[in-house]
Amino acid sequence: MKDEKLRLVYQDAKRFLEKLVGKEILEEKLEHIRTYKVNNMYDLYWHLLLAITNKRNMSQSIGSIDDLVRFFFDFDPHKTHQHYGLDWKRLFRRVKRGRTPPGPMDIGKEGSYWVVFSKGALSGAAFLANFDSFQAFHAFIMCFQDHDFAIPALPMVLEREIYGMGFPLACDFLKEVGYTNYGKPDVHVKDILCGLELVDCRDNYEVFKTLLRMARVNNELPAVVDKILYLIGSGNIGKPEIKIGRQKKVFIEEMKAKLAELNRHLGHGSCGDEEQGHENTEGETR
């Protein structure tokens, strides 16, 4: 029965968004997710640095990642690690001497964005430096892709290895570099899934599993499912000429009525997947 709900929610979410932005524009966004792949360590490290800043208002304090290129040796994680090691204060002071970022730089404030970023940048470089090439990194990633229970273990590893990169940001990093088995369990996705009672709590792992399951029953990539829910929740299409505003309240109310109707239908003789004894095979892809 839950699979039927997940199927209905995704299909209606896509139609809901198509009405707001147009099918062509939506497909353009989704096609980028399906096809974009990083293929070198420089772009990989750039995306890692960007992912670290993708929370609250941190990016406004750090500024453009591109403006930091000279401090990270053209975004070479190996050279960055060789030069700084894990000495985040050295990096912090070098940036402060060489650039005036948009946000304050206070080396004595443990939780300040620049302290968090400096620590995350160097622990991220240290992690990537374990791989001699992008091909070696890719092979490591693929070790986690053979089963749906293994897929979320990878962001758990990144969460432990890279300072300031929690589970959602690790998922964000992986999806943005082209690993489409990953969706980010952010506040907008959580609001929608919780609002529709498709998850029992806002736990990152539980939300991630539900995104993965929703993708499987719809024969879609988890990253695409994530993007559609995010666009509805945030209203941020990425095109300044298109403003739709946050639509999650409207969508949730519409879907509640449809899910109630589905419950009535299933309760009058139609069986869900679980009642029929059917299982959707777990294994592979966001």
Residue ranges and their predicted role:
Residues 1-113:
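Structure-specific DNA junction-binding interface
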Residues 1-42, 116-125, 133-286:
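C-terminal accessory module of base-excision DNA glycosylases/AP lyases that mediates lesion recognition
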Residues 53-61, 77, 129, 181, ...:
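Short alpha-helix boundary/capping elements
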Residues 96-99, 125-132:
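Generic hydrophobic/packing signal
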Residues 104-105, 122-128:
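Aromatic-anchored, charged helix-turn/loop surface patch used as a conserved interaction hotspot
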